[in-house]
Amino acid sequence: MSAQVNLQSASPNIDSPPAEDVSYSLYFGLGQCLTLVDHPEVFKVSAAGKAFGSLLTRRFGRQYADARFLDIGTGSGVHSLLLRRLGMKSVTATDISPQAIDVARINEVANLGAGDVRFIHSDLFDGLDPTNDAFDVILFNPPGWQTPSAAFLQALQRTESAQGLSIEAMFYGDRTLKRFFDEVPLFLKPGAKLIIGLNSLVGIPAVMHALCQKHEADYHIDWCLLERHEFPLMLYTQQWRQLQGLIHEEIVDWTRQGAAYCRFNEQGDIIWSYEILELTFSRRSIDGNGQ
């Protein structure tokens, strides 16, 4: 059941979406249901986001109540609010979009009735200080595929339907992940965990290889695959749907080159893999010989 949320009374910085799209509800198990604003400038929670939330519900119980959580790229705030609902006392959330932060705060009041989450407008870790902001668990469910080819970008420039389109909203996920992985160890307490959801179209092997190259001299990095889901490729805007042919060709090229993974169902739809990993970073000790 949808709830009616008055956006303008909750925040003067948010323009109200059409009345028929005011809100939507998601259920994650253990009685945890959240009602979220459906605002055109903030990503609606995807099937992958729902799977990520369901994992959090199963993974983090009362023993984590006093742990410090950081949710990077919070979007609607769904995972931060879910953690608070599950009893986590200290939750910080960042997003590069000021509209997302405004909507997340509205969602917080609608679902929790109080401002308990520390929301910060920030590009990844930019708004945080590693000397004061160290966390037991960091969450990241990054959007985006890998960097598009030069041929794709040239074709896109010749396509009228691509005018005004934000390419960064869908592509360059590998660059975002590189920036994220470059800094994340600085914000993890000893023994802390990183929970991250990766899209197989981002090029997971290359991303993990770059992570090891960056940090293996200073950290022992361990990871495990917590769960994997398969979802059909969804193009959420009319502009992206008009570019479906170009996008499919690009994804097929990535897959043929071994730079990404997808498969096709009987209808010819692209099916991608969503993979949730848990990572730990243990600082290497240095003996007298520097080994």
Enumerate the language-model features and the residues they cover.
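SAM-dependent Rossmann-like transferase core, predominantly class I methyltransferases
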Residues: V5-L86, L246, A260-L279, R284-G290
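Generic structural signal for residues in well-ordered beta-strands
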Residues: L34-L36, V117-F119, I221-W223
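Phosphate/oxyanion-binding active-site loops and adjacent basic polyanion-contact surfaces
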Residues: K44-G49, I96-A100, G173-L177
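Conserved SAM/SAH cofactor-binding pocket of Class I
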Residues: G53-T131, V137-P148
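Short amphipathic alpha-helical segments
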Residues: R105-I106, A150-L153, V207-H209
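Mobile active-site "lid"/loop adjacent to the S-adenosyl-L-methionine
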Residues: L139-T176
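Conserved Class I SAM-dependent methyltransferase catalytic core
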Residues: G173-H229
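C-terminal catalytic and target-recognition region of SAM-dependent MTase-like enzymes
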Residues: P205, A210-Q291
